[in-house]
Amino acid sequence: MTNILSPEKSEHDQELPIRPSYLKEFVGQQQIKENLLVFIKAAKSRNEHLDHTLFYGPPGLGKTTLAKIISNEIGGNFKSTAGPAIIKAADLASILTNLEKNDVLFIDEIHRLNTLVEEVLYSAMEDFELDIIIGEGSAARPVKITLPKFTLIGATTRFGLISNPLRDRFGIPMRLNFYNTEELKQVLNRASKLLDIDLTDSGSEEIAKRSRGTPRIALRLLRRIRDFAVVDGKSRIDKEICDFGLKRLTVDSIGLDSNDYRYLKFIADNYHGGPVGIETIAAALSEQRDELEETIEPYLIKIGLVKRTPRGRVITIAAFEHLKMPIPNKSQNQLNILNENE
């Protein structure tokens, strides 16, 4: 699934030279910032490495940015890889043996590490030692390599898929949450200054309200609306041009797009609001289950349009109202599910 509202990274997102370098520049996640500042100062005062850190939560909220900030704050080199890229234990050993003291090793999608790689990582995280086998067959022998004191930072959108032994080795687990409108406005205002964009307060608010609580999406929308403004001959990005551009991008007033409507209407039209299993939804929409669970559902659940129940997904009365569809005649049991927590 590729669309303007996807919180996943794209190569074009990296073109924006606006990533903050230090905690004081990072907008949002206030409690995380304050706690990180304490942990970093304490580690530096003791002349120790920062404890291994795990960032988890929906995509697009700043996990990679915070990892780079930590590297800058502690004065180490930043080395980055991803769980799927580390196929063999030897791949991990090669990375670890090239680290220096106070380096930060960032592993994105850490929940996708395979078991053999994880087992090598345990002793590296806990004892800063690497146990590897050199040679083959009868000539094989174990070798223990001492590693420098480094900080491992893991990032995941699927916290529940990380094994307990690996999860327990992170001294600093931190959940990143969706941003509110005011925080997203701050992100947009900072970006507009760095990019020399004349963005009005009403313009930043309009983009923020439709950005699904996600900075990555907000910045992507800002860049696309700038395109509409340039072609339309406007030097200032205000609410009017934002509304025009967002409608052209099929982003509605609360940040839903055609993929969200497909999801909601499938459940509404075919299952009278649900419940319906996620595998059925994925098959009907020709989407991967992971894509639905990581890209579409988190925001729909956050704003109260979808609920996950033991029997499957259910869209709420608020969803029917937003779709401007009549609420179906359902059994009292089904209505109880729809009305739950409304």
UniProtKB/Swiss-Prot annotation:
Residues 180-250 are annotated as: Small ATPAse domain (RuvB-S). Its main location: cytoplasm. It catalyses: ATP + H2O = ADP + phosphate + H(+). DNA binds at residues 289, 308, 313. Residues 253-342 are annotated as: Head domain (RuvB-H). Residues 1-179 are annotated as: Large ATPase domain (RuvB-L). Keywords: ATP-binding, Cytoplasm, DNA damage, DNA recombination, DNA repair, DNA-binding, Hydrolase, Nucleotide-binding. Disulfide bonds: none annotated. GO terms for cellular component: cytoplasm; Holliday junction resolvase complex. Mg(2+) binds at residue 64. Its EC number is 3.6.4.-. It comes from the Bacteria. SUPFAM superfamilies: P-loop containing nucleoside triphosphate hydrolases, Winged helix' DNA-binding domain. It is found in: Cytoplasm. One of its GO terms (biological process) is DNA recombination. GO terms for molecular function: ATP binding; ATP hydrolysis activity; four-way junction DNA binding; four-way junction helicase activity. Belongs to the RuvB family. Has 3 domains, the large (RuvB-L) and small ATPase (RuvB-S) domains and the C-terminal head (RuvB-H) domain. The head domain binds DNA, while the ATPase domains jointly bind ATP, ADP or are empty depending on the state of the subunit in the translocation cycle. During a single DNA translocation step the structure of each domain remains the same, but their relative positions change. Participates in UV-tolerance of Synechocystis PCC 6803. The RuvA-RuvB-RuvC complex processes Holliday junction (HJ) DNA during genetic recombination and DNA repair, while the RuvA-RuvB complex plays an important role in the rescue of blocked DNA replication forks via replication fork reversal (RFR). RuvA specifically binds to HJ cruciform DNA, conferring on it an open structure. The RuvB hexamer acts as an ATP-dependent pump, pulling dsDNA into and through the RuvAB complex. RuvB forms 2 homohexamers on either side of HJ DNA bound by 1 or 2 RuvA tetramers; 4 subunits per hexamer contact DNA at a time. This is Holliday junction branch migration complex subunit RuvB. It comes from Rickettsia prowazekii (strain Madrid E).
